[in-house]
Amino acid sequence: MAREKAQILDKDGIRRSLTRIAHEIIERNKGTGNLVLVGIRRRGVPLAERLAGRIKDIEGRTVPVGILDITLYRDDLTTLAHQPVVRSTEVPFSVSGKIVVLVDDVIYTGRTVRAALDAIMDLGRPKLIQLAVLIDRGHRELPIRADYVGKNVPTSSREEVSVRLQEIDGEERVVILETAE
């Protein structure tokens, strides 16, 4: 059983982090003309939708948002479950020639992002793929890094980062959980 060790971000901290990331995305890409956001199921989806809302507030332009299910692209599929739950990928636009910003809640080993890259490449040939995460907790196993980070949170192997979003969890905060070995 995991116990809560510390709260990293509250509702306002999450909001401020996403607002800053939205500004960084706009600035780095010189606007939103060729931009699409793709949220990685599960918590990357509401974060991508929120970023799109912030970008619209700032730029006055709507940025398309897609939903990516990476279940069948994971390299740990056999350890997940006998019958993994596969949900649909909903990317109702072409990614070819676009600047695709993948959005997820936490980056840890990099394996989820690797699977997402494979899934995106099966949809087309983007001009550029960038990564936005709310939390970077370190401990990468693959040479992958986020372009946009809400907060860097160094953790130990006994700790987990839990992002709780209103849309999914009914509360809004990020906490570190400590697990018993």
From Swiss-Prot:
E.C. code: 2.4.2.9
Motif (PRPP-binding): 100-112
SUPFAM superfamilies: PRTase-like
UniProt cross-references to InterPro entries, sorted A to Z: PRibTrfase_dom, PRTase-like, PyrR, PyrR_bifunctional
Reaction(s) the record says it catalyses: UMP + diphosphate = 5-phospho-alpha-D-ribose 1-diphosphate + uracil
GO BP of this protein: DNA-templated transcription termination
Record key words, sorted: Glycosyltransferase, RNA-binding, Transcription, Transcription regulation, Transcription termination, Transferase
Pfam family, one: Pribosyltran
Source organism, top-level taxon: Bacteria
GO terms of molecular function: RNA binding; uracil phosphoribosyltransferase activity
Record flagged with keyword Transcription regulation: yes
Its biological purpose: Regulates transcriptional attenuation of the pyrimidine nucleotide (pyr) operon by binding in a uridine-dependent manner to specific sites on pyr mRNA. This disrupts an antiterminator hairpin in the RNA and favors formation of a downstream transcription terminator, leading to a reduced expression of downstream genes.
The family this protein is said to belong to: Belongs to the purine/pyrimidine phosphoribosyltransferase family. PyrR subfamily.
HAMAP family hit by this protein: PyrR (MF_01219)
Assembly notes: Homodimer and homohexamer; in equilibrium.
Protein name per its UniProtKB record: Bifunctional protein PyrR
Organism whose genome encodes this protein: Pelotomaculum thermopropionicum (strain DSM 13744 / JCM 10971 / SI)
